[in-house]
Curated annotation (Swiss-Prot):
This is Acetate kinase. It catalyses: acetate + ATP = acetyl phosphate + ADP. SUPFAM superfamilies: Actin-like ATPase domain (SSF53067). ATP binds at K16, H202, L203, G204, S205, G206, D277, M278, R279. It comes from Rickettsia felis (strain ATCC VR-1525 / URRWXCal2) (Rickettsia azadi). One of its GO terms (biological process) is acetate metabolic process. Catalyzes the formation of acetyl phosphate from acetate and ATP. Can also catalyze the reverse reaction.
Length: 385
């Protein structure tokens, strides 16, 4: 029988479950990649990218996903579940590292739902369901915000009265699990030490950038929420707060409508009027699609400039996540606007998606590497066993 740990990443309409084999107290291989998604009135169940079933939705979708998983799990007689790990988007001001979850911790995390209303409820719903169904094992919560606890106070503050800072209205930063994976596995992937002043660009459906100094997060593009920073697939990125006030006061939009607009109808999708998928936009002949891509690139270039200033220089730029690792076109568009940093890209290496894509005489080393949030959670879980 194989000992395994389960890693869960829940969204509003989907649940990703990765199952890793454990040998000699170390994470060995991912043996199952399970994806459940809500599709119109059915829940689709995929195992290792193959659809296994389509079930009519008759109840709460997330609860049904867990039940479908459990039905499948009961048939896996050769697997022994020893722990679960859960991606939790927001850890607030108190959770600066992964924790074993018990009743009080679960209540403390529930209090943070207003800080991440579109992610935290589903993260916690799945966590609580696993707590109920598998009481005899440990359940570990890993936070996207924890990596940024090393940010100095000056980088966290808004220009609001201090009482709001004290209440936790600060810049938290997100995608921390991705940044932790890339920074901690960098030498393993590239055979090089992580340079002192590094900027990591996590570019996917959600995008952010992080300035890392001596291996620690200094500041990042996302702030109080995952809306901040660069433009994303469906999110606005950095937005003048006056726009929100205008939408409410003059466009007569409700806060719910504004939330829907900022999180789900903006970004690449809103600007192009076509898609949030970069591959679709790159293949499009639409002027609006081209403008959306140009704006995406422009905002990223500005953010790299800002983070370079925060670091007082930059030694290394790392692209990661779906777009960052895989789109040679987007990397080229970004780096062509960074010639002032002395960046030079080897077009052949870039087209091949090699890890090191800069030339030997580039003043800043540029890399394109994968991220693996599930694996970094699995490694964190093992520290508790």
């Amino acid at each position: 029988m194989k000992d395994v740990i389960l890693i869960a990443n829940a969204g509003s309409s989907s649940l990703k479950i990765s199952i890793f084999e454990i040998q000699n107290k170390k994470v060995k291989d991912k043996i199952y990649n399970i994806f459940l998604e809500k599709n119109v009135n059915k829940i689709l169940f995929h195992i290792n990218k193959k659809q296994e079933s389509a079930t009519d939705i008759k109840d709460d979708a997330i609860e049904m996903m867990i039940d479908l998983f459990e039905d499948w799990w009961k048939k896996q007689e050769n697997l022994n579940l020893i722990a679960t790990g859960h991606r939790i988007v927001h850890g607030g001001k108190n959770f600066n590292k992964p924790v074993i979850v018990y009743e009080k911790v679960s209540k403390d995390l529930t209090v943070l739902i207003p800080l991440s209303p579109l992610h935290q409820p589903y993260n916690l719903q799945v966590l609580d369901l696993f707590l109920q169904k598998y009481k005899e094992i440990s359940h570990i919560a890993c936070f996207d915000t924890s990596f940024h606890f090393t940010n100095p106070p000056i980088t966290k503050a808004f220009g609001l009265p201090k009482k709001y800072y004290d209440k936790g209205i600060i810049r938290y930063g997100f995608h921390g699990l991705s940044y932790k994976y890339v920074s901690s596995h960098f030498k393993e992937m590239t055979k090089e030490d992580l340079p002192t002043k590094t900027i990591i660009a996590h570019l996917g459906s959600g995008s952010s950038l992080c300035a890392i100094k001596n291996g620690l997060s200094l500041t990042s593009s996302m702030g109080f929420s995952v809306l901040d920073g660069v433009m994303m697939g469906t999110r606005t990125g950095n937005l003048d707060p006056g726009v929100v006030l205008y939408l409410i006061d003059h466009e007569k939009m409700t806060t719910k409508e504004v939330t829907e607009l900022l999180y789900k109808k903006s970004g690449l999708l809103g600007m192009s009027g076509e898609s949030s998928d970069m591959r679709t936009l790159l293949a499009s002949n639409s002027p609006d699609a081209k403008f959306a891509i140009d704006l995406f690139v422009y905002r990223i270039v500005l953010e790299i400039g800002k983070l370079t200033a925060a670091l007082e220089g930059v030694d290394c730029l790392i692209f990661t996540a779906g777009v960052g690792q895989n789109s040679a076109v987007i990397r080229k568009m970004i780096t062509e606007k960074l010639l002032w940093l002395g960046i030079k890209i080897d077009d052949t290496k870039n087209q091949k998606n090699e890890h090191l894509i800069s030339t030997s005489d580039s003043k800043v080393k540029v890399f394109a590497v994968p991220t693996n949030e599930e694996l970094i959670i699995a490694e964190e879980v093992m520290k508790f066993l």
